């Protein structure tokens, strides 16, 4: 029986833990060769062991998305080695400070935007030739419901995710006539380290896990997926079209 991602090449950022780790494992289980990128070498090595244990394969890339020079070299290196990139899962991000908007320092504000927005822009620029070399390229960006709610004390994170959504939708429109499909994913509250950091009083056992989300990411990453420029909302279990003013 053919696996849904058989033979596909997938790059996953933030792959050492949480959603990225669960997605990387699920992609490998579905037949993809996973290029796992994260800052944490130990976490990547554990992921590699798990993937190999199920007969999958992975390439580990210990790197920081904030390292612009390293990210600039990544896309050409992927293209040279594999000739294409079928799946980009841009998952890595940071929460930043949870504080009144005007109490956030310029350094903190810039750091959140650099990782959550600018690093993803640089990454997309770097891997675009490899994505477009695929017969069915998929660019998937992890967003958040915070981008739409205007939550008190969440401004840096919320604004950065709103900007990421605008970037992804713009790119989806630019590539609409190509084989590339661009999707956003709102995972909702999941049992992750970032969620525990943001909501320390919450019982994590009441939340779904990254492993619950992963099969949906496999579906979006598959060659059969046809939607572009939309948001898969995991809490609702459906694809949403952003409501744009006329």
What residue spans do the PLM features occupy?
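Conserved glycine-rich cofactor-binding loop
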Residues: 9, 16-18
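Conserved glycine-rich Rossmann-like NAD(P)H-binding loop of the short-chain dehydrogenase/reductase
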Residues: 32-46
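Substrate-binding pocket helix/loop in short-chain dehydrogenase/reductase
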Residues: 99-101, 108-113
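Active-site helix of classical SDR
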Residues: 124, 160
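Alpha-helical segment proximal to the catalytic Tyr-Lys
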Residues: 129, 172-174
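Residue(s) in the substrate-gating loop at a strand-loop-helix junction
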Residues: 144
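C-terminal helical subdomain
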Residues: 177-180, 184-185, 192, 200-246
